[in-house]
Design a protein with these regions (language model features):
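Iron-sulfur cluster-binding cysteine motifs and their immediate structural context
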Residues: 1-4, 8-12, 17, 21-40, ...
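Non-heme iron-sulfur electron-transfer modules
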Residues: 1-8, 28-68, 130
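Gly-rich Lys/Arg/Thr-decorated short loops/hinges at beta-loop-alpha junctions or inter-strand turns
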Residues: 2-6, 66-77, 140, 198-204, ...
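A structural-propensity feature for long, helix-poor, extended segments
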Residues: 4, 120-171, 272-287
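Beta-sheet entry/capping signal
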Residues: 8, 24, 30-33, 100-105, ...
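N-terminal amphipathic, basic-rich helices that act as targeting or association modules
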Residues: 16, 68-71, 76-119
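Thiamine diphosphate
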Residues: 114-115, 213, 219-287
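N-terminal leader/propeptide and maturation segments of large enzyme subunits in energy/redox metabolism
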Residues: 139-212
Length: 287
């Protein structure tokens, strides 16, 4: 039990869809969630606004547990997806685990429709300004598109790493050198490189150098976003993964690139009206 904190799930009444799905699905009906008229809940807006001013607390549990993951800030909010949509719950969880270092290639489909519904995008940032970097590709080439993102990120990280090593050779014995050596040891570890990159940036800002070393320092600071190892993802539905984009997906898997694949398998073409895909079951009724 975590005794030093109090936990509250604060609802923003102005962004509630009013669908009632949360109440229907809640295992503690009448005790935890009850639908009420909007005008009786507007006072909760003050509580919502106050909640946004609170400082972030260190997660007292491992985020890679069912319970611990829910103490992480979601970086997907107010998506505008269909009421009761099951896709957004999974996408939200991914942002709680990896969102502040996440690159996302999204195939056309439902996840693209609610993921970039003009004029807003539901993917957001934390208080440090970090959040998922999202882009969309068509059905047939999203897997290849995501690998292009992977290769681009790898090249940019390799270039920054080379500059860090060059500056390290010129600054032996400094706080930056110690931070850089630790970062290089954990270069390919996502969460460790994130923490170590903060130490590198802080040490760089205090480092007093001139000439070639100053140019290296400026370059690293300007490209500091690439110090942290990125979590690379491709999203798509079963229409993409099983049908239209299967050929590209097959090649990407065979290439053994460091990229994660998330298939939102609804067993139909959800975004275009429920047509059957290769994931559809024989004799099923889809709605």
């Amino acid at each position: 039990e975590i005794k030093q904190y109090k936990f509250r799930m604060q609802v923003d009444p102005l962004d509630c869809q009013g669908c009632g799905v949360c109440v229907t699905a809640c295992p503690a009906k009448e005790k935890a969630l009850v639908m009420q008229p909007l005008e009786t809940q507007l006072h909760e807006q003050d509580n919502w606004d106050f909640s946004l001013t609170l400082s972030d607390k260190k997660n007292p549990m491992s985020k890679f547990t069912v319970k611990g993951s829910q103490f992480e800030q979601p970086l997907l909010e107010f998506s505008g997806a269909c009421a009761g949509c099951g896709e957004t719950a999974y996408a939200k969880l991914m942002t709680q685990l990896y969102g502040d270092r996440m690159y996302l290639a999204n195939a056309t489909g439902c996840t693209q429709a609610w993921g970039a519904a003009a004029p807003c995008v539901p993917y957001t940032t934390n208080k440090e300004g970090w959040g998922p970097a999202w882009s969309n590709s068509l059905f047939e080439n999203n897997a290849q598109f995501s690998v292009g993102m992977v290769l681009a990120v790898e090249q940019q990280r390799d270039r920054v790493t080379m500059k860090v090593k060059d500056l390290l050779a010129l600054t032996a014995g400094t706080d930056f050198a110690a931070a850089a050596e630790t970062w290089l040891e954990n270069w390919d570890n996502g969460d460790r490189s994130k923490a170590d990159s903060r130490a590198v940036i802080a040490a760089l800002k205090e480092l007093q150098v001139d000439g070639a070393a100053a140019e290296l320092k400026d370059f690293i600071l300007e490209n500091s976003e690439h110090l942290t190892k990125k979590s690379m993802w491709m999203y798509g539905g079963d229409g993409w993964a099983y049908d239209i984009g299967y050929g590209g997906l097959d090649h990407v898997i065979a290439s053994k690139q460091d990229v994660n694949i998330f298939v939102f398998d609804t067993e139909v073409y959800s975004n275009t009206g429920g047509q059957a895909s290769k994931a559809s079951n024989i004799g099923q009724v889809a709605q």
